[in-house]
């Protein structure tokens, strides 16, 4: 997911048949359309990840990914002894920068059809997720009633919920989702205003584990 355009693909055309688009450009439909057209013209399969909980342009991403192959959990514990966390997203959210979740790269289940016409594979991160069936059900049915943060991986335990229904009903969401300055934020105030609309106390309406188990049965057995 470090391919930012066709230039990165051209030197290795004979080495791959599928690839994933850069997370940082996931919400840019015009860019995704161009990459999808190029992929089809060259016989390649284009994919994207829909539920990444990573910060947009996270400066710790490469470091964090490297730790996956080098005893990440052990090194994390060592780091904690020195007051250092390898999870910069956690540190960032601990500081109260909750609007950064809205300007990240995840895709709402209801918005997925906007992107599916350009990609052939939609990846869902569930390997270490606490509620994998809930994630599968949400994206398979293009519908989710609850806290959007529960769908992402990593999933930070925010003090309140990102109400998906409120997000879908907000006139600000399309502007934030398709913001042309997403990778060079001007801090215009839209994300902060949107946070005020959708960041709500956790409630009884959020899906339970029992709901997730039922959804799993419906999804796989009909």
Task: Tell where the protein language model's regions lie, with residue ranges.
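Active-site pocket-lining/capping segments in soluble small-molecule metabolic enzymes
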Residues: 1-8, 15-222
């Amino acid at each position: 997911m470090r391919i930012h355009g066709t230039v990165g693909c051209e030197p290795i055309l004979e080495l791959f048949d599928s690839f994933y688009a850069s997370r940082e450009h996931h919400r840019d439909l015009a860019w995704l359309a161009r990459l999808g057209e190029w992929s089809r013209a060259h016989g390649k399969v284009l994919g994207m990840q829909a539920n990444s909980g990573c910060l947009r342009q996270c400066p710790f991403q490469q470091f964090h990914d490297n730790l996956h192959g080098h005893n990440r959990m052990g090194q994390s514990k060592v780091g904690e002894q020195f007051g250092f966390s390898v999870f910069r997203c956690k540190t960032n959210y601990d500081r109260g920068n909750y609007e950064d979740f809205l300007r990240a790269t995840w895709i709402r289940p209801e918005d997925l059809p906007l992107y599916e016409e350009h990609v052939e594979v939609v990846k869902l991160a569930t390997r270490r997720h606490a509620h994998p069936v809930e994630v599968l059900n949400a994206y398979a049915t293009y519908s989710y009633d609850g806290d959007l943060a529960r769908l992402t991986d990593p999933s930070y335990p925010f003090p309140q919920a990102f109400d998906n229904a409120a997000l879908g009903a907000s006139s600000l969401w399309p502007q934030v989702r398709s913001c042309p300055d997403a990778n060079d934020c001007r801090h215009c105030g839209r994300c902060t205003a949107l946070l005020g609309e959708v960041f709500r106390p956790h409630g009884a309406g959020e899906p339970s584990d029992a709901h997730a188990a039922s959804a799993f049965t419906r999804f796989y057995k009909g």
